C-alpha cells in the first residue's frame, strides 16, 4: 500500500511522578507564607462525563431518521455519547447534495442542544452485502464533508473509519476496497492501494481533534509498525470479547498485544457481536481484565449477545460504566492562606486519572476564586494538558496553577473552585460538557460539586488583603 499520510505528533509523555511540594516563595508574591491544605474523598459512583462511557443511538439514520426521543433517553440514562449512523446509500456514484450537508449540520446542532456528543459512522451499506463506493468516490465525499465536520468538531470526539464494505467495517467490499472474504476477485494489492486512499482522505478531512477508529488490526500494523508512533488513529472493535478471535478480528496474540499498546495513546471502543463465535468472554472477570488492558473508552449499550446482562448479573456493570475512558479524581489542594491585591499566588492541585483510558481531547484544569460576599471571580487556567495523565494511575500528579490577583480585586475571603471545561467555543461555557471529578461531597468540610457552574468547591479559603 502507499505510504501513510504523516502521522500526527507523538502522544503526550506519561504523567510524571508527583512533584515535591514547592517552596513557599515559588509562584507566590505578597502572600501570607502560611499554607492551607485539604484532601478529598473519592467516590466509586458512576459519573456521566463527556467523550466516554456507554453510548446510545440517534436513530436508524442520523440524517433522515434522527430520533430525538432516543437521544434524550440516552442522556437521561447517564450516557453522554450517541451512535450517529449516516447512510450514504443514495450517493454511491454521485456527489453529496448541498441539502444533505445542510441537514447533517442541523443534526449535529440537535445533538449539541441535547448535551450529547457522537461516535460517527458513514456507510453505504449497513448490511452484509458490502455494496459500497469506489475509493475515489469516498475521497470525494470526505472532501465534501470536511467543512461540516470541522464546524461540528466539538461534538465528534470519535469517528469510525466506515465507508468501506459491509456495515462500514472494511471487509466484503464490492468496489475493490477489500480482498479475500466476500470480496470477489479483487487482488490484495489493489485493495491495499484503495484502502490507503481512503485512510489518507480520512486523516486529511476529519478534524484533528477527532479520533478515527479502524476495524482491522492487520491494517493498523501495516501502516504504523510501532503502536506508539501516532496519537490519532485507533481501533473500533465491532466484536469485542466475542469468541476466541473476536469473531475473526485477531489472527495472533501479537495483534492483540499491538492493539493493547496502541490503545494507551489512541481511542479504543466498540461493541459485541450478535452472531459471535463461541465461547464468549462475557464474565465480569473477563471485562475487568480486558477493559483496562485494551483501555476501553466507549461502548455500545445495546445488549447484542447478553454481555451487558452478564455484567449486570455478575455485579460489575456499574464498575464497567464508571471505569471506561478517563476518570479524573482529585486528591488534594494546597495554597497560601492570604495574598495582597496586585500580588500572585500558586495553587497546587494533586489529581490522577483512574479510568481505563486517557483523555483524547485536550482539557486543562481551571482554578477559580469566588468572593464569598460579592460573588466576584478570578480565574486561571493551568498550563499543560490533561491528556498527559496516564490512565489507571496509582499515585497523584501535582498541577501548579499561578493566579495573578488584580490590584483592584475585592478584598475579603474567596472560596477556591476547580473545574475542567470543554475547549471548544461552542461548548466551553456549557456545564454539561465539563468534566465532573470522581469525588464525593463533604458538606461538613465545604467540599461540594456545583452542577450549575460545573465546579468543585475545594473547601479552602483564600483572603485577599
Language-model segments: which ranges?
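Active-site groove signature of glycoside hydrolases
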Residues: 119-128, 145-189
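Aromatic-lined substrate-binding rim segments of carbohydrate-active enzymes
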Residues: 67-125, 135-138, 210
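Aromatic-lined carbohydrate-recognition surfaces of secreted/lumenal glycan-active proteins
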Residues: 156-167, 199, 203-223
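An active-site-proximal structural segment forming one wall of the substrate-binding cleft
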Residues: 100-113, 133-160, 191-205
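Extracellular/luminal regions of secreted and cell-surface proteins that mediate adhesion/ECM remodeling
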Residues: 5, 322-465
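Boundary/entry segment of secreted carbohydrate-active catalytic domains
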Residues: 24-80, 85
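Ser/Thr/Gly/Pro-rich low-complexity, disordered linker/stalk segments of secreted
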Residues: 1-32
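Substrate-binding cleft of secreted/luminal carbohydrate-active enzymes
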Residues: 216-334
